[in-house]
């Protein structure tokens, strides 16, 4: 199977249990080949549901939507580490996982949370450019501007307070830059802005 992954044009991780995926593939030569090819070649890595959640360095292992925003209700672990600076959650809108992703992000405030709706995904290029695809929504939860939270001062099970968290809702074609935290209407508007920046230099 190592030879197959060396020759393949891409790989897709299915849903199920993200912790099981990381237990099976974490710290293996198989995963290392995938990571090196993803970073250095035009190699496509895809995931659905749990497979998408496992892509990031910081990964949600579990935690119910009803208990979210009570300190400690969201369980965090290590993902595949293909993408840094993000936390990904799936079935986001239909299962009401807003609180779950907010707690995960406020615990790691330098990250950007990506909540994937049903029948919707994101194309991530250059490790930081997100383009929404599909018929539903992607919700971005940005903890970079949080100016107050009590999460480090309260006991487990107590309500979490947050001030200054930012949220963006992306539909098909919308673009978000993870590094700069900037929203673009589409790739064309991004390219126009980059061209203007080059012209001004």
PLM region spans:
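Glycine-rich, phosphate-binding/catalytic loops in enzymes
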Residues: 27-31, 62-64
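Short, active-site-adjacent cap segments at secondary-structure transitions
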Residues: 18-19, 52-55, 121-123
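Catalytic nucleophile loop
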Residues: 14-15, 38-59
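C-terminal and late-domain segments of enzyme folds
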Residues: 59-201
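Glycine/threonine-rich flexible loop motifs
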Residues: 18-28
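Glycine/Thr-rich phosphate-binding loops of Rossmann-like dinucleotide-binding domains
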Residues: 21-22, 56, 63
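N-terminal beta1-alpha1 cap of cysteine-dependent amidohydrolase-like domains
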Residues: 1-14, 175-178
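Catalytic-core regions built around general acid/base machinery
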Residues: 4-7, 29-42
